[in-house]
Amino acid sequence: MEKLSALQEQKGELRKRLSYTTHKLEKLETEFDSTRHYLEIELRRAQEELDKVTEKLRRIQSNYMALQRINQELEDKLYRMGQHYEEEKRAMSHEIVALNSHLLEAKVTIDKLSEDNELYRKDCNLAAQLLQCSQTYGRVHKVSELPSDFQQRVSLHMEKHGCSLPSALCHPAYADSVPTCVIAKVLEKPDPGSLSSRMSDASARDLGYRDGVEKSGPRPPYKGDIYCSDPALYCPDEREHARRPSVDTPVTDVGFLRAQNSTDSAAEEEEEAEAAAFPEAYRREAYQGYAASLPTSSSYSSFSATSEEKEHAQAGTLTASQQAIYLSSRDEFFNRKPSATYGSGPRFAKAASTLGSPLEAQVAPGFARTVSPYPAEPYRYPASPGPQQALMPPNLWSLRAKPSGNRLAGEDIRGQWRPVSVEDVGAYSYQAGAAAGRAASPCNYSERYYGGGGGGGAAGGGSPGDKAEGRASPLYATYKADSFSEGDDLSQGHLAEPCFLRAGGDLSLSPSRSADALAGYAASDGDGDRLRVQLCGAGSSPEPEHGSRESLEPSSMEASPEMHPPTRLSPQQAFPRTGGSGLSRKDSLTKAQLYGTLLN
């Protein structure tokens, strides 16, 4: 029994232990289920986060690819821009080098032009002082009145030629005087310190040749050498007619008439003192420079290297018919005999009696005078221009010949006279026979133009070669015929030398006009029809006829710019410059503007 009860107790105890273990296992299962549920939730959350991170990474990767593509494009664009900027940099470097060279050239050109303008201003002021109308045309200039640099040039010139200024013991009134011929010779030579006044080789050759030919022997001093071939110098009875207007014509400039009327005994004494005080070389070479042309200023070679060729090309534009007419009319002029009234004036007879050598006696009487053979005929002014005839101050360097009918009141006054053109006057050739004939003639202005010497050399326009050599002959080597622009009225009335005005009134340089202007050498050779040829530009045109007395009437006063008041400048009435050579100041300004455009 006791075993059964023990077994019963052991069975109950085992049953309790089993229920306890079962209860514990249930608790563990519940805990495990909760843990598994938690882990599943965490796993699901981690998967969601992983999906988000994966999507984010995918977006980042796509953005990175897009950025890579954009960066590549930008790099290509930057490379192209760098190449373009390198090319532009190289081009701009070349342009900077070119602009630097242009600036240097422009600076040199500006310096040259400034120096040239200063020299031209000084020379123009000096020429205006020397050549303006004063009490006498043959005014003796004092050395102390001249500018200092020009005084040095005069003294050097006189030392070079082996003479000195007249002493006060011999000529106390003219102790410090310099004749006009010396001043003309000094002005004819270039200033050695100037860049712009280098003469051409032909000019220097002509200077040396002319000095060598003309200084070969002494000759008597003619007053036509120191002063121009004016009727007042040779014929005192014509002085009043030549220098005073007729009573019925209006006079506008009284001061100019006063200067015209003042060839009195003081002027004659000054002439004689000047002729006695200086050696023969100066009196012999007095105004021969006026028969020359103006050489090209070599400082403008950077502007126009072909200006000399253009001048020489312009020199040969005469047709064969024009040359033939010119030569025939010139021969007709030289074959004429002087009339009885030609040498009637006592002053001219006195001058003609001083002929020293047989050569002078042969050459001089034929053409030593350019004045009117009518001593009793008063010179007349043209009528005053009306207000509708606004006229320009006459250009001394104009090359256009006009008819000289001074009684036609309705026409343009400028068309009634022709000032001597330096281009035409200089168009003669230096030949030995002609130079010998000119050296012996008392009036070298007219004979230098009509230079028919021993060899019968052609005068102006004879051939292009002669014209080209005539251009190289010296006259005021620092000037050009084109130095004065067309509109410049810088006191051209005072720059007019009487020999230019005189020959402009009497001897217009168209060829048959020159033959007609001295038609009084044949006593009754009057109103014949002659073909008048204008030796300017390209063509020839006949002009209306005029009697010999009409063509001889205009005096130096009619030809003077002082008698034509410049009321208003009309461009259609301006003188055409057909034969101008070289560069004028206006052309220089045009070239400078062209350089400025290139620099811009």
From Swiss-Prot:
Coarse class of the protein's main subcellular location: cytoplasm
Entry-annotated residues carrying Phosphoserine: 200, 229, 246, 265, 372, 463, 473, 483, 485, 508, 510, 514, 560, 570
Residue positions, PTM N-acetylmethionine: 1
Stated role: May sustain the structure of the postsynaptic density (PSD).
Signal peptide: none
Modification type Phosphotyrosine: residues: 137
Protein name, per record: Brain-enriched guanylate kinase-associated protein
Domain of life assignment: Eukaryota
Annotated localization: Cytoplasm; Membrane
Species annotation: Mus musculus
GO BP term (any one): evoked excitatory postsynaptic potential
Subunit: Interacts with DLG4 and DLGAP1 and forms a ternary complex.
Residues modified as Phosphothreonine: 249
Disordered as annotated region, ranges: 192-222, 298-317, 537-590
Modified positions (Asymmetric dimethylarginine) in chain numbering: 380
Keywords noted in UniProt: Acetylation, Cytoplasm, Membrane, Methylation, Phosphoprotein
Compositional bias ranges of the Basic and acidic residues kind: 203-217, 543-552
Membrane topology: Peripheral membrane protein
One Gene Ontology cellular component: cytoplasm
